[in-house]
Amino acid sequence: MIEDMTKFKILLTPWHGTPIAPPYIDSTFTEDIKSKNPYNNPVYSNDWFNYSPMRAGKPIPLTDNYKLPAHFYWICSNVKRLETDYYSHSKGVVLSSCLFEFLKQFKCYDEYDICEVTPLSRKLAPISDKKYYFIRFKHLAYNLFIDLENSNRIKRMNKVITSYLYLDFQLREQTAYPDIFWMKNVLVAKDSVADLINGNGFSGFRMVELKDFVDEYTFRDTHPYPTLEEMKDRDRKWF
């Protein structure tokens, strides 16, 4: 029986952000530091950085050539101090150990690889007291319990590749649903769990109602050249 009353919140990051929790960081991953400039000379022991679980619609086997290292350095430009608990990267997400351990207590069907991350400045100085993990998703399970085609959604504006924003999810009929799940790099959680996440004071994001997320990204999509003040003003609405 479908849980008609199941509602969700979704992760929203600041538009402008703060110096200690920026929404975008010019950065490089490297497994080792073998030069004075690892930002421009990263070291990889295999091809893990180029792994994608799907290519041309076909699954790519996770061979040894694509396996994550146990640890790598995250070389960040123009960041003197890093306090964020969440950062979205093109290859996965970076989570603080505090957030990762907190999320582990909740039911989740997604599959992922994980390794430790040490953030450093371009001068190779530590920029955070927090411990971080890099999460690379192998399989996202949301299609198992959400019918995206029949969900209440709107097409995003000004996008070359068609994508959608969801006002509500059409749940498939099953007996149980996860407490949290990931849609690409975006965390979605049941209302009660999202409220617990917000109540823990994590930095760099907030869990918001789906409608609020749609409203915010519709505004951002229709304002491609915002001023800093416009961005900060929107952030004050949520953070």
Name the predicted role of every residue range:
Residues 1-61:
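N-terminal ordered "arm"
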Residues 74-80, 96, 168-172:
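Short amphipathic alpha-helical segments, especially helix-boundary/capping motifs
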Residues 15, 20-24, 39, 62, ...:
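Generic low-complexity segments that are intrinsically disordered, proline-rich and/or Lys/Arg-biased
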Residues 57, 66-71, 107, 152, ...:
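Short, flexible coil/linker elements and helix-boundary hinge sites characteristic
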Residues 58-90:
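A glycine-rich, hydrophobic loop/mini-helix early in the fold
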Residues 83-145:
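Extracellular-facing segments of soluble proteins and assemblies that are Gly/Ser/Thr-biased and enriched
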